[in-house]
Amino acid sequence: MKQNNAACPIGCRYCVITQVGYRRCQWEQKFLIGMNKTVTILNPPPDKNDMNVMDSFYNFPLELLEADRVGFNAISDPFWQKYGPELDWFLEHVAPIVKVAACVTKMPVSESLMRVLATIKNFQLNVSITGLEIIENSTTRSRLKTLELAKKYGVKAFVIIHPYIAGMSDLSFLPKLKAIGYDCVDVKGLRYDPSMADWMPQAARKFYEGTEGKEVLPEDGWRKKIEVAGLQLKSLRQWTEENQQTEPRLSRNEAEKRVRKLLQYANITSSDKNAAVIQAAIERRL
């Protein structure tokens, strides 16, 4: 069932960027900057042979990101070796001017890289574990190992079950998560696309058919499994805010001005209304 995807080595069959039509069009139109209510995301170009778009990444006006929370590479996995130079550049040039520098990954993170991440005090590592190995080129075991390394080296890390697919996601990893020192998780739903019927069993499809474009999180017992494992639910946004630096800050006037300029580059990738995303981007900088 696994697929190869030139855009990402994980090749998730449910990928909202490659498998959900309207989201794919969004990212094709504007790939460099994504914005939601939690973070701004800086994406390196999918085609690294196009020098014009590579210049747009390396010459991006970084003052527009100052004092924000900024994630690296949401259109692929940030730790894919292909983007190693761009990750290094992000950690060197973006991390020092923001409140939070973040990555969301499903890939294994090596011990040597974890040691580097540990030196960046405002870095946050978000590990997505789904229990969906059959449709991902990654394993639950490797992601638990990454989380163990984060504990070993003191890297702030958080777990997201993203997406949870009713009738498919295997949550048997939850007790192990608790055992290695994590106390809370976030759970996100699935944005269904009819093309997913090719690999999704009917027992799961019944929860999603007719919901195209909406994030759906069925109540099928996953909350109880989290409770039994001794874990608590917490949103990624709340955890990020609780663990962010308080500096740097901008004045409200300056924050509003920079966000207006940032919107010229940005693709708003949120189910929230645009006005709410823009207001959140301003407030993050204060």
List PLM regions with ranges.
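Conserved AdoMet/S-adenosylmethionine-binding subsite of the radical SAM
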Residues: 54-225
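Canonical Radical SAM [4Fe-4S] cluster-binding loop centered on the CxxxCxxC motif
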Residues: 1-49
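Intrinsic disorder/low-complexity detector
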Residues: 1, 13, 72, 283-285
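Auxiliary Fe-S-binding modules of radical SAM enzymes
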Residues: 171-286
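Selective for proline/serine-rich intrinsically disordered segments
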Residues: 42-44, 59, 161, 246
